[in-house]
C-alpha cells in the first residue's frame, strides 16, 4: 500500500466527515471522493492500513470513521501542505 494512496484515502475520509472523529462514512463515498470505481478493493485495504495505524476505525455497520489521531494527522498534513 503506497503512502500516497493512504494520504488520499485519509484526506477523503476526513473531508467527508468534516474532520470530526466518529462520523461514519461509507466506503462507496470514499471511493467516489478519490476517483475510484465503486467496490475498488484498494479502498478497504487502505482503510485497514489506516486502522492499523490508529487513524481510522470500522463501525459495526461497515462504515468507517476517523479516530481523534486520524483527525489530528489530517490537520497536520493540511497545515504542512499549506506552507
How should these model regions be labeled?
Residues 1-21:
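Short alpha-helical segments that sit at the start of domains
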Residues 20-34:
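Short acidic, hydrophobic short linear motifs in intrinsically disordered regions
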Residues 36-52:
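Short amphipathic alpha-helical interaction segments
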Residues 51-61:
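A short, conserved structural fragment
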Residues 62-68:
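Minor-groove-contacting beta-hairpin "wing" of winged helix-turn-helix DNA-binding domains
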Residues 69-83:
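Short, amphipathic alpha-helical interaction segments positioned at domain boundaries
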